[in-house]
A protein has these predicted regions:
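Extracellular/periplasmic helix-loop-helix junction of adjacent transmembrane segments
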Residues: 3-36
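Glycine/proline-centered helix-kink
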Residues: 113, 118-130, 181, 253, ...
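12-transmembrane solute porter fold
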Residues: 1-7, 63, 221-426
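Helix-loop-helix hairpins in multi-pass membrane proteins, especially solute transporters
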Residues: 37-41, 45-171
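Loop-to-transmembrane helix entry/capping segments in MFS-fold secondary transporters
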Residues: 19-20, 104-114, 353-365
Length: 435
């Protein structure tokens, strides 16, 4: 919420050049998350998640305080980059704490509330009008005070979360992962030199090859435990998480209504984004409750139907309508579908995973989420199109390519969900036979 307001305020005060710098920092923050979150999560078997949570809160507090200091747009971009690191730490740590402290029968509802925190924060930003230069500073002071309070609570509460492994941390695997993913991210972003691209590709290939060999050698003690990679349910759920976050970032739901209003020379309204985030806030806990009640398949189907209907309705209304009514319906359905699927997928990826493997799978899950966001932004910027508003889609060949991409992504998402449900049904049947 804070970073969104920060970008808007500085874009107004400093012009397009400053906004471009901040957009760079936003993308760089997503890349930092992809590179580091798995390593941070894997350390959760050696260092208590509350320690990571405290570290993330300290970083967030410092970056929030730094954003209040007047300075150049470049300085502010670095503040946002550090903020992304702190947010990543708190995301991983809070997930691990929720998973370790919740019995399996109540894990769906807990994950539902955990997923709901994002739309809650974004909804608060819209209601409080954090994009206003007049409101941004007092809201920032409030966020800083809340961060300090939560940090004090974390430091003073007893630590009950699971920590335990007799294996030493796979430092070699962690270094290989950092090098490989960093090289791959640089390869995707950098356009300056074909020679550099070849070098980065070779570095990434060698690093991932060495990581594969290291994983085979260390087995369950590797950075990515070997047995996790042999679980089709986990792999399918990770793929689906990546596809979902790709679709969300590629479609750019947050700003669709703003561009729609500008295109029609209307004043942007807060109602459409409020509808998007409010629907996500409500449906996430509901999806978690239904999962705990044994309605997993219903949640998966409901999420896909809501998302497809929401995207279709939003695209149609953005192309033809001159009122917000249809747009509101599309964003309501989209927000509900996104949150419903997110809860289902995060639950699916952890189902049947042992406590020792939670850190590995948790790290992979948040990494998959960040990866989908990076790839979605990358494709959207390179294609120079906006799916929902129709910008850049006038040419028939471009439109056909984008439609084909969306069809493939939805097919991948549906296929991954089908694999998850079939594998889970097979496991349930075997457990019933054994009983």
């Amino acid at each position: 919420m804070l970073d969104h307001g920060l970008a808007a305020v500085w874009g107004v005060d400093r012009g397009d050049d400053a906004l471009g710098t901040i957009e760079w920092a936003t993308v760089a923050g997503d890349v930092v998350a992809v590179v580091t979150l798995l390593v941070f999560a894997r350390l959760g078997n050696h260092i208590r998640p509350t320690t990571f949570l405290a570290a993330g809160l300290v970083i967030l507090g410092l970056s929030t305080a730094g954003s209040l200091i007047p300075g150049s747009a470049t300085l502010l971009a670095w503040v946002m980059l550090v903020s992304a690191l702190g947010a990543g730490l708190t995301m991983v740590a809070s997930m691990l704490i929720v998973l370790h402290s919740t019995p399996r029968r109540g894990r769906g509802l807990s994950l539902g509330f955990w997923v709901a925190m994002y739309p809650l924060a974004m909804l608060a930003g819209e209601v409080l009008d954090i994009n206003s230069p007049q409101n941004w500073r007092p809201i920032t002071y409030g966020i800083l005070a809340a961060t300090v309070v939560v940090l004090i609570v974390v430091l003073t509460q007893p630590h009950r979360e699971f920590v335990g492994t007799f294996d030493t941390f796979d430092l070699v695997g962690a270094l290989l992962w950092l090098v490989g993913v960093s090289a791959l991210a640089w390869l995707l972003i950098d356009e300056s030199s074909p020679v550099r691209a070849v070098i980065l590709g070779i570095i990434a290939l060698v690093a991932f090859g060495a990581l594969f060999a290291q994983t085979r050698r260390r087995g369950s003690a590797a950075l990515i435990a070997a047995e996790v990679l042999t679980r089709p349910v986990v792999l399918a759920a990770l793929l689906a998480i990546t596809v979902l976050t790709f679709l969300v970032r590629f479609a750019d739901f947050d700003h669709a209504a703003m561009w729609w209003a500008i295109d029609r020379e209307l004043a942007p309204s807060d109602t459409p984004p409020i509808a998007l985030f409010a629907a996500g806030l409500v449906l996430a806990p509901v999806a978690g409750f239904l999962i705990d009640a044994g309605k997993r398949t219903l949640v998966a189907v409901l999420g896909v139907v809501l998302l497809v209907a929401g995207v279709a309705a939003t695209v149609v209304e953005l192309q033809s309508a001159h009122t917000e009514n249809g747009l509101l319906l599309g964003l309501l359905l989209s927000g509900a579908g996104i949150s419903t699927l997110a809860v289902y997928l995060f639950y699916a990826v952890f189902h049947g995973v042992s406590p020792v493997q939670l850190t590995v799978v948790g790290g992979l899950a948040v990494t998959a989420s960040a990866l989908g966001a990076v790839l979605g932004e990358f494709v959207r910027q390179r294609a120079q199109v906006d799916l929902l508003t129709g910008y850049g889609l006038a040419h028939p060949s471009v439109f056909a390519d984008i439609v084909g991409l969306i069809v493939v992504l939805i097919a991948l998402l549906a296929g991954a969900l089908l694999i998850v449900e079939r594998r889970r049904s097979g496991s349930a049947d075997r457990e019933s036979a054994d009983a």
